[in-house]
């Protein structure tokens, strides 16, 4: 049993707290659907400020919009393999801002499962590790 089982009002409060934590995080956060192309459904303010893409510009698009000439295909293969197996992925990649400038990003991508334990979305936690 969890606290949600004892206090239904706490669930609503917890959702609001988590929404605020995500929106005001210093790290870039993206949520995508678990379907071909992994369309983006949410990015936080830190993501928009860092990449230059507003939420309106990126929601519905593939995260591949951030990739470019120096993004390693082998890394993307490992990423896709992990996602297809429903596993957490952790790695670093060279990606690109809207203005074309490159950055090195550390990623952690976590599958989000629905009530039937089927992956419905992915949570991508990102941070700039450019040296």
Model regions and ranges:
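PAS/PAS-like sensory domain cap-loop motif
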Residues: 47-58
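Conserved hydrophobic beta-strand signature of PAS-family and PAS-like sensory domains
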Residues: 38-41
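Sensory-domain boundary capping and coupling elements
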Residues: 107-109, 126
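PAS-family sensory domains
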Residues: 34, 94-100, 113-114
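PAS-family sensory/regulatory domains
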Residues: 59-70
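PAS/PAS-like sensory domains
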Residues: 24-28, 72-73, 82-92, 105-106
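PAS-family sensory modules
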Residues: 1-36, 119-131
